[in-house]
């Protein structure tokens, strides 16, 4: 079965064939697009990942439990609320497919969660911590999702692109959840390890999720991309196991359209 990452690469390759003039470095390094996450990557790390490593080596880079746990919450959200998901189909590219009704969503995804292979011992401990909060966080996510109030058909992972000023390659990303008028960018926050106690043990505490939290500026940039690419009302839903915050133009100046548009120039520095 083709992975989401491989499906995205195939769809992007098809999109790139429509660009008639590409510089030599694009062919040399096999770079065919930028992504919203790349816009938040430092130059040295970007150079290492996209100029030094091959595409196959990038795919083998380890992720961490917090990232994987966030993916699992997204998967649960798709099964719980989604009507359609965009997946790659050979010969057709990305195709809109119905999401069949699913019972016992949490039980289904916990199987995937338990198959995760930790990168090291610290990551294993973090994954065990995440497991304890997974159901609680999913409950908070459902409350936040319902507050947004998406209506009609809800689509998941639709691929959208944006040509940035002075850039020869498109920026491409996939929308977490959307209806005809608005979208949700989901961010999950997991307990973080505190400084070790005198006896060498450590506790784990919940991070802040109020405006300006750690990672706020990076997430704003991603929301700005999806806003500019879709023209839909943005909602940034940030969740941890004891609560959630929903940010949009009604309660956050940073997410007003005029302010998101100001991030366009910053976005193109990739």
What is each stretch, according to the model?
Residues 1-174:
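Metal-dependent nuclease catalytic cores that hydrolyze phosphodiester bonds in DNA/RNA
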Residues 153-269:
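Mg2+/Mn2+-dependent nuclease catalytic core
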């Amino acid at each position: 079965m083709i992975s989401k990452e491989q499906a995205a690469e195939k769809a992007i390759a098809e999109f790139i064939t429509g660009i008639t003039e590409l510089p030599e470095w694009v062919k040399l390094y096999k770079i065919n697009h930028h992504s919203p996450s790349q816009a938040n990557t430092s130059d040295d790390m970007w150079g290492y990942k996209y100029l030094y490593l091959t595409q196959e080596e990038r795919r083998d880079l380890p992720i961490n439990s917090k990232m994987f746990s966030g993916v699992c919450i997204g998967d649960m959200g798709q099964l719980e609320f989604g009507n359609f998901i965009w997946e790659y189909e050979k010969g057709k590219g990305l195709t809109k497919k119905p999401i069949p009704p699913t019972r016992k969503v949490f039980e289904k995804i916990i199987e995937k969660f338990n198959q995760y292979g930790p990168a090291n011992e610290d990551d294993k401990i973090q994954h065990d911590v995440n497991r304890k909060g997974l159901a609680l966080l999913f409950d908070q996510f459902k409350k936040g999702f319902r507050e947004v109030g998406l209506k009609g058909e809800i689509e998941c992972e639709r691929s959208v692109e944006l040509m940035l000023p002075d850039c020869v390659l498109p920026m491409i990303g996939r929308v977490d959840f959307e209806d005809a008028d608005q979208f949700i960018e989901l961010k999950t926050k997991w307990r973080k390890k505190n400084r070790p106690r005198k006896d060498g043990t450590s506790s784990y505490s919940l991070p802040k999720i109020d405006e300006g939290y750690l990672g706020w500026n990076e997430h704003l940039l991603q929301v700005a991309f999806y806003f500019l690419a879709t023209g839909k009302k943005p909602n940034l839903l940030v969740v941890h196991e004891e609560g959630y915050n929903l940010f949009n133009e009604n309660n956050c100046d940073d997410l007003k359209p005029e302010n998101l548009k100001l991030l366009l120039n910053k976005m193109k520095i990739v």
